[in-house]
Amino acid sequence: MKLTILILEDEPEVRTAVERDLQVFAPTVRLEPASDVDDAWEVIDEISADGDVLALALCDHRMPGTTGVEFLVDMMDDDRTAATRKVLVTGQAQLEDTIVAVNEADLDHYIAKPWDRADLEATVRDQVTSYVADMGIDP
């Protein structure tokens, strides 16, 4: 079983930048990019089929046809992702959206764009560590 980080971002350049900034985790954690919500659910299906777990979802807010907050709320209704740590990475969420993310999606952290690489790495490390501890996984 391998821990996985989902990077849900519709803008290719931004998604690539997040992946690049998280390469430090690649030796021990599976990094899975997704360009939209449908793609994200397909990735989650693949993660489950491989016997791996989704430890962390890094999610943009504004995407075509939906929002990252709606996706994070939907994750709460899926047994495979309800315990996943959830981080909103955006520069466009309104206060109301953020409140919904916190109250209904159990948002664990918020990172504003543009992000600081060291802050992103520290947040990911903290969130994955919290997931491992919460789930009782032996690293």
What are these regions (language model features)?
Residues 3, 12-37:
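Two-component/phosphorelay signaling modules centered on CheY-like receiver
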Residues 9:
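Conserved acidic carboxylate
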Residues 125-139:
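The C-terminal output helix
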Residues 19, 33-56:
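Acidic, metal-coordinating helix/loop segments flanking the phosphotransfer/catalytic sites
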Residues 59-60, 90:
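Active-site residues of response regulator receiver
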Residues 114-124, 128:
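C-terminal output helix
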Residues 63:
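Receiver (REC) domain active-site loop signature in two-component systems and cognate sites
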